[in-house]
Amino acid sequence: MENAKMNSLIAQYPLVKDLVALKETTWFNPSTTSLAEGLPYVGLTEQDVQDAHARLSRFAPYLAKAFAETAATGGIIESELVAIPAMQKRLEKEYQQPISGQLLLKKDSHLPISGSIKARGGIYEVLAHAEKLALEAGLLTLDDDYSKLLSPEFKQFFSQYSIAVGSTGNLGLSIGIMSARIGFKVTVHMSADARAWKKAKLRSHGVTVVEYEQDYGVAVEEGRKAAQSDPNCFFIDDENSRTLFLGYSVAGQRLKAQFAQQGRIVDADNPLFVYLPCGVGGGPGGVAFGLKLAFGDHVHCFFAEPTHSPCMLLGVHTGLHDQISVQDIGIDNLTAADGLAVGRASGFVGRAMERLLDGFYTLSDQTMYDMLGWLAQEEGIRLEPSALAGMAGPQRVCASVSYQQMHGFSAEQLRNATHLVWATGGGMVPEEEMNQYLAKGR
C-alpha cells in the first residue's frame, strides 16, 4: 500500500498503527447488535444448523465403525469441557489481573480423528459431499444405516471422485484423513507454515500433499485452480464455505448440553465469554454462530489472532474485510501459530458475523509460548501455540472498564461469569515437537 493510502487509513483508523507496530492490541466492537438484529446478516438459520446436526447423527454409526476412537461416543465427534482453576490462578499472578468468574477450557485440541477444531467443519463437509453423491446415485437413502458406506462397493464408487483443499495444516489433516477413509482421492495444498509432521501424517493415510513456499492464500488459490480443471473434483473452500461453517456451528447446541450436564447456568446474571483463535475465520465464525443460537445475547464471543496475522481484526475494524490483507499494511504474516497464519480474512465470515462479535485482540508468539508452558505446568494439558490464543482473553475483558460499561455488566454479573477458552489443536503433536514448544515458554 502506498504511503498516502496508508496514512489516510491510519488517520481514519488509528488502531491500525498499533497493528503495524505489532503491538498486542484489543478492540472492543462498538457496533455489536442483539442476535435478533444481527442474525439476518449471516444468511443462515437455526434450521440450517439443525440439518447439520441431523446429518452428523445419520453418519454416527458409520464413524463409530470407521474410527475406533469414536466408538465410545457412538460416532459423535465431541470434546471435553474442563475447569482449569490452577491456570486461572497462574494467569492472575503473571498478569497481575484478577479474572472474575470461572475459567474453563474446551478441548477441541483433543477431538478424535484429527486432534483439532477442524475435525468439526472439515469432516462434516466431506461427509456432506459423500452423502450428496451417494443419494444422487441412488446408492443411499436418508433412512439407511450409514455404516454400509464402509462396504467395498461404496469405496469403489467414491474412488471415482476427488477432493482438494488448501490449508496451513489442521483443516488439511481433517479433510485428508476423512476423505481417504471414505475412499475419495484427496489432495491437500499446504502453505509454507504447515508443520512437517502434519504433512507426514497425511501422506501416511495415502493423501497427496502439494507443498508451497508461499502462505495460506496461495495454497488455497492453487487448490481451487487444480480442482477447476476436473469435473469430478470437489474443492473445499475454507474462505467461503457455508457447509464448513455449519459443521462448526453444531458445537453451540453440544456445548449447551454439556453446560446443562454440569449444572452451569448462562443467562443475564451469569454471562458467558468465549475466546476463539481465528485464522481465516470459518472455525471461530461457525462456532460463534452456533453459540449465539444456543445462548442468545448472554454469550459474548471474541476472536484472537497473532500480532503478525491480524487479518480479521483488520478486515472488520476497517470495514474492508477481504479487500485488505495484513501484507498490504506491511505485516509479514509469519507466526509460530501456524493454524492462524492467514493474511486475508474470509469476506463471508467477516460480513456475516461482525455484528455478533464483542471484540478482537492480538497476542505475540512469545505470549502464546508462555501460556503454553504455564498450562502444561499447572494443568498437565499440552496444546499447540495457536490453541493458546484464546487464553489471553479473560484478562483483557476483566481489565477493560470501558467494555464492561459498554455492555452494562455489574461486578456481580462478572463474578458469576464463565470464561471459556476454545483450545483449537495440539492433541496429536509429536512429543519432540511439543518439547520444542515447551522450551520456548518463559
From Swiss-Prot:
Its cofactor is pyridoxal 5'-phosphate. Pfam families: PALP. GO terms for molecular function: D-serine ammonia-lyase activity; hydro-lyase activity; pyridoxal phosphate binding. The keyword Lyase applies. Its EC number is 4.3.1.18. Keywords: Lyase, Pyridoxal phosphate. It catalyses: D-serine = pyruvate + NH4(+). Monomer. Belongs to the serine/threonine dehydratase family. DsdA subfamily. This is D-serine dehydratase. It comes from Shigella flexneri serotype 5b (strain 8401).
